[in-house]
Amino acid sequence: MTWQNDYSRDYEVKNHMECQNRSDKYIWSPHDAYFYKGLSELIVDIDRLIYLSLEKIRKDFVFINLNTDSLTEFINRDNEWLSAVKGKQVVLIAARKSEALANYWYYNSNIRGVVYAGLSRDIRKELAYVINGRFLRKDIKKDKITDREMEIIRMMAQGMLPKSIARIENCSVKTVYTHRRNAEAKLYSKLYKLVQ
């Protein structure tokens, strides 16, 4: 009986993920079925708080889960995923450790807004606020990663050592360590833990 339940559950999860990978889906990451289900239900739940129809949201918006499990992929491929969502209204859902990166992408690309999941007293209102287009630069609640820090984060995510990074960036190894330390303070974590 347990084997059949496990098999059934695996089939259900696999089927759900395949559905999420279709181009008409508006929630990333395809690997997080709980996030997908929870956010889908939350968007339907806040229907009365938003100005747009649910159909327009499904068509024009992309909601991206920036959690610690997916950060490496987003860091290594930020140009790719930003290109893939071009023309869409992108909403980043940021966990505490990814807030500074979310702010970086908000400032440096065409992101509609950021929902800070860790700070939110009422995530429904925050989500509606962003969907309705009211999120502005003044709403940024935390520091953002600088361009130099982001370059160092990218290189470290690729497995490069500080000495190699210093050579490429034409700076001292001490400067690399300083930028890394500053980024870690903004991300509330050691970089090696985030970019494994």
UniProtKB/Swiss-Prot annotation:
Residues 138-196 form the HTH luxR-type domain. GO terms for biological process: regulation of DNA-templated transcription. Belongs to the EcpR/MatA family. Residues 162-181 bind DNA. Signal peptide: none annotated. One of its GO terms (molecular function) is DNA binding. It comes from the Bacteria. SUPFAM superfamilies: C-terminal effector domain of the bipartite response regulators (SSF46894). It is found in: Cytoplasm. InterPro entries: Sig_transdc_resp-reg_C-effctor (IPR016032), Tscrpt_reg_LuxR_C (IPR000792), WH-like_DNA-bd_sf (IPR036388). CDD domains: LuxR_C_like. This is HTH-type transcriptional regulator EcpR. Part of the ecpRABCDE operon, which encodes the E.coli common pilus (ECP). ECP is found in both commensal and pathogenic strains and plays a dual role in early-stage biofilm development and host cell recognition. Positively regulates the expression of the ecp operon. Keywords: Activator, Cytoplasm, DNA-binding, Transcription, Transcription regulation. Induction: Negatively regulated by H-NS. Positively autoregulated. Also positively regulated by IHF. One of its GO terms (cellular component) is cytoplasm. It comes from Escherichia coli O81 (strain ED1a). It holds the Pfam family GerE. Disulfide bonds: none annotated.
